[in-house]
């Protein structure tokens, strides 16, 4: 129970090595880290509220396939979410996925095995801590060039991707 809470909230604490576990459990926990912490927390991942809105929007689209003229607002609690909020969550999800894929391809191109690269990028982008494979305890076997890519992933995960993307827009730097 402790491990699942620690990893899904991206706290990074472990009480035992994953090497002793059946392989599907650590992989399941790593995928849970994509959900991450709650909104407003410093936890990594997509955040629970964003995943919830993505789920509700997917459910709405399935209902629209059955009933094309259905007006189906997405609500969090009793509050109806504006379509712009939903679009911004999809934009964040797309940017998150893009950063993940670019970092994964970057680490693989540095000569890291695919399984280890996948786990290293998950651990860094989600600010997770533990991972699987050769990066389960430390990153000493990872080439320095891959560590630079993983550093970028870690910064993107910690500071939120949109916060970093804003720095690269010209309007941010105008007075």
Model-derived features with residue positions:
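Membrane-proximal intracellular helices of multi-pass ion channels
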Residues: 1-175
């Amino acid at each position: 129970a402790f491990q699942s809470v620690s990893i899904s909230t991206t706290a990074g604490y472990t009480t035992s090595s994953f090497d002793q576990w059946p392989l599907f459990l650590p992989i399941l926990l790593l995928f849970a880290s994509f959900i991450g912490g709650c909104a407003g927390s410093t936890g990594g991942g997509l955040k629970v509220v964003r995943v919830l809105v993505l789920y509700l929007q997917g459910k709405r689209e399935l209902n629209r396939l059955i009933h094309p003229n259905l007006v189906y607002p997405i609500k969090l609690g009793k509050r109806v979410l504006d379509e712009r909020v939903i679009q911004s969550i999809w934009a964040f999800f797309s940017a998150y996925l893009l950063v993940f894929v670019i970092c994964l391809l970057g680490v693989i191109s540095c000569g890291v095995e695919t399984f280890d690269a996948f786990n290293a990028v998950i651990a860094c982008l989600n600010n997770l801590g533990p991972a699987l494979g050769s990066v389960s305890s430390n990153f000493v076997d990872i080439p320095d060039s891959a560590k630079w890519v993983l550093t970028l992933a870690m910064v993107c995960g910690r500071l939120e991707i949109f916060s970093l993307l804003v720095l690269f827009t010209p309007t941010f730097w105008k007075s």
